[in-house]
């Protein structure tokens, strides 16, 4: 089936209750469950089968996994036992500590947890071997349905499991997230903030502990109170350091959850503490304020109880905040709203969302370092009209997320290095060209270009109009992206790449024979020689005429014009509908062709006989066609070669078809200039003649 275009642009920020059905059957969780109950069967998910394809894509299991339902592993399975808590999360044989750290943080926010794990499921009445979970993806909530067959070895769960062997919510949640991303293997390696955002639809913020503000403790305290999800880790300098244990019992390159922050009285002083959890369920900090450290002997039983202090090897531990800053390198916070943690006020934020793509050859221009292509990136107009309350500037947050890179890992895709720049917008209401960026500096930009799924930063700018340009660092790199803009006051955003405007002059009337130029007289003689008495040429004859003339032109390198091009030319110029070209029609086309040749030569900078697809937007606009990025992408796919170049024959074909389509549309849109109405016969007739 052909690709169906869906318009990009601003979208509403969805709420979880609108979670979209994702199962290939098109049925909801409840519909499939009722169907299984009526049939007396347990659900088997054909979309994510109990087979190796759901486990790995680049390797085979080293041990013979057996897929079993919880009721085949234990006698009395429970979905959630005594509430979903962080102690229900123990890492298995999969390198997805980042996901487990995010799940542990999720359990601290019951409202967010209930959104991800719907409460309408259990192993009790109504059990049919089917469960579902809801995740946020690129500004929409998805309902992911799975069966409850889990990979086991010797009757033990291989991957994520609960400390209580008859509790299965965490293992099933991991399976649903693996399905969302294509396989269990796709979950290897990552950042906790990624899953935190998928659990909440929140906004990411990262702090370097060594460069954190003076009120860093208060920032983390406020984040936990607001229900934000927090993770932390220690940087590694090489692959060899990954999961290396420090002398203090901490693991480098390993994702931890921040589960609490508090103060304790110790020898007349208030000591700031922070509680951390290792998703392994063991291996803990062994320094000051660790589970068995002597400091706790100076703390009364009531205070110890309040802080839930126990000397258990459960992976959770307290440490002094100053030690935390000294040993950990980064803290990732997923805020459920964009309110700055440095401020006390809570605001109502306006959100707009843009879905877009970087496509090689048309919109994958790279960063400003690559001036020749940077201007071809998607451009979004941002209108800031209202100042913040009591301020002279407008606050907003920009979050740029590249889509589905984890899902595409099986095809060799990596997380790209991304960022964005913001420019003051000139009065022109159009896609800005190369010269604008040659002479204008950005007004603001992301702090860095980095290979993370999302890059987000806060800004304050005076009211006005700006152009926001999201890009990869290197040009020619392809990805889809989701751009979210949060503003305290309503900001108007518009995609500058979606406009289509055709400006074609009326075709000139042919000159009478006695007023023909010397060039036209030579054409008439050649035409008579080829066409005969009727003075009409077929596509084959037109091919001969054009190539005979163009080969004498020394200023353009080109291969012969193809027969297809000549058929398209006749389709454009043939007013009688007999499939041939009369001499007067040819004269009109020749004038047009000379203009197009000059246009091609203008953009064939190196005189190689080809032009870059990145120049296509400007070249087509000069010919009268202002096209959307989506149309440009289709043209590049159809006409460009592997080196993203077009020769003259391809360029001519493109222009002929564009003009033909435009003139047909103009002829049919008599009442409404933006729409035409066709029945199936008219539509097919139209497409066969363009």
Swiss-Prot record:
Ca(2+) 4 binds at residues 604, 606, 608, 610, 615. One of its GO terms (biological process) is proteolysis. Residues 42-337 form the Calpain catalytic domain. It comes from the Eukaryota. InterPro entries: C2_III, Calpain_cysteine_protease, Calpain_domain_III, Calpain_III, Calpain_III_sf, EF-hand-dom_pair, EF_Hand_1_Ca_BS, EF_hand_dom. Residues 1-24, 498-519 are annotated as: Disordered. Residues 338-521 are annotated as: Domain III. The keyword Disulfide bond does not apply. The keyword Cell division does not apply. Ca(2+) 3 binds at residues 574, 576, 578, 580, 585. Residues 518-552, 561-589, 591-626 form the EF-hand domain. One of its GO terms (molecular function) is calcium ion binding. CDD domains: Calpain_III (cd00214), CysPc (cd00044), EFh_PEF_CAPN9 (cd16192). Expressed predominantly in stomach. It is an enzyme of class 3 (hydrolase). Ca(2+) 2 binds at residues 284, 291, 312, 314, 316. Residues 522-690 are annotated as: Domain IV. GO terms for cellular component: cytoplasm. Keywords: Calcium, Hydrolase, Metal-binding, Protease, Repeat, Thiol protease. Induction: Down-regulated in gastric cancer tissue and in gastric cell lines of differentiated and poorly differentiated types. Calcium-regulated non-lysosomal thiol-protease. Belongs to the peptidase C2 family. This is Calpain-9. It comes from Homo sapiens.
